[in-house]
A protein has these predicted regions:
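Extracytoplasmic ligand-binding site segments that recognize negatively charged/polar headgroups
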Residues: 21, 34-48, 60-78, 83-215
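A bilobed periplasmic-binding-protein/Venus flytrap-type ligand-binding module shared by bacterial periplasmic
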Residues: 135-142, 178-180, 248-260, 279-280
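A ligand-binding cleft/hinge motif common to bilobed small-molecule-binding domains
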Residues: 93-97, 217-237
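Short beta-strand->loop
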Residues: 104-111, 124-127, 229-246, 255-257, ...
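Periplasmic-binding protein-like
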Residues: 117, 132, 160-169, 190-194, 198-201, 271-293, ...
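Extracellular/periplasmic bilobal clamshell ligand-binding domains
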Residues: 294-331
Length: 331
């Protein structure tokens, strides 16, 4: 794989962006954007450097946090009347909360045509940059491949009781299972899973690292690119895709009160463009754009179901969260 600096240089000759000259000029007059993002530090840095190399007249100021801290920060700033972001890159479920509160403006990038329709907001408030397919990870020293769970029902076997970990805030997975299986089956399953003495923690990366280190044999709902990355580095970890594979949407949007809207649109265009999506591919992630396959061929075989953001928008993420916490005994 090309190193990121070489990849960046190579990409700039490949694409004409959807922003026309007048749009670029308007963005350069604004001179900067404030980006709120959940993308990991190194990946975020490379993306920003690539954008600023293409558009040296626009400076990106970035704040990074988890999806939970993103939700808290944006809503806290909203209450104080001082939302500072020009661009928000976060989970689709959290973005639905922002949309419902009137915090986003419509922007349909010309690049969005290349993103599958069911991975875009039908009203044009946000667009998926890349999905995060959730898989089950296991420590290869503690679990033989033939013994690893192959189905959701396998997670209920007595042999895994007290030996699995899961993120505390899997509300979108919980909501999507209800859409795919039906509410009755999904609730019944989660109640059975709750009897398996699951160790709940905060952060998918943290849990993946714990599995790789042998601190816990199995991690449920891990991000596939993170497991593949650890495996590539020699960690004692592998993964299995349990059907249905739920994909968390990592989406981009512009706040309704963005101080630098033209520069924000330019950044959105860039992340959705061929160049931006090839960077996503270079990070080992799944590009959201049609025609650009993941580097990892096994990951490319996954056919994920996008998070049920429509129902989350209608019902409310907090409603799913409350029921999820009650089932799993979380505070």
């Amino acid at each position: 794989m090309l190193s990121f600096p070489i990849l960046i240089i190579a990409l700039f000759n490949s694409t004409v962006y959807s922003a026309d000259t007048s749009g670029v000029n308007a963005a350069e007059k604004e001179a900067e954007i404030v980006l709120y993002t959940v993308m990991s530090g190194d990946n975020n840095r490379v993306m920003i450097e690539a954008f600023q190399k293409k558009y040296p007249g626009v400076t990106v100021k970035s704040w990074w946090g988890s999806t939970e801290s993103m939700l808290n920060r944006v809503l806290t700033e909203e209450r104080s009347g001082a939302l500072k972001a020009d661009v928000i890159f976060s989970g689709g479920s959290e973005m639905q909360v922002f949309k419902k509160r009137g915090l986003l403006q419509k922007y349909i990038s010309a690049e969005a045509e290349a993103i599958p329709e069911n991975f875009r907001d039908p009203e044009g408030y946000w667009t998926n940059v890349h999905p995060l397919s959730m898989v089950t990870a296991y420590n290869t020293d503690q679990v033989k491949p033939q013994d690893a769970p192959q189905t959701y029902q396998d997670l209920l076997k007595p042999q895994w009781k007290g030996k699995m970990s899961m993120e505390r805030l899997e509300y979108d997975w919980f909501a999507t299972l209800q859409r795919v299986w039906g509410r009755e089956k999904a609730i019944a399953y989660c109640k059975k899973l709750a009897t398996q003495n699951i160790r709940f923690d905060s952060g998918h990366t943290k849990i993946a690292t714990m599995v790789a280190a042998g601190d816990i044999p199995i991690g449920i709902n891990m991000y596939e690119y993170r497991i593949a990355s650890l495996k590539k580095k020699g960690a004692k970890i592998d993964w299995v895709a349990l059907e249905p594979v739920v994909a968390i949407l990592e989406v981009i949007a512009i706040p309704s009160n963005a101080a630098h809207p033209n520069a924000a649109k330019l950044f959105v265009d860039f992340m959705l463009s061929v160049d931006g999506q090839n960077l996503i591919r270079g990070f080992g992630r799944i590009p959201g754009r049609r025609g650009i396959e993941p580097l990892d061929k096994d990951i490319a075989k996954i056919k994920p179901i996008p998070t049920d953001v429509a129902t989350i928008y209608r019902v409310g993420l907090d409603v799913f969260g409350k029921e999820y916490r009650e089932i799993f005994g979380l505070q």
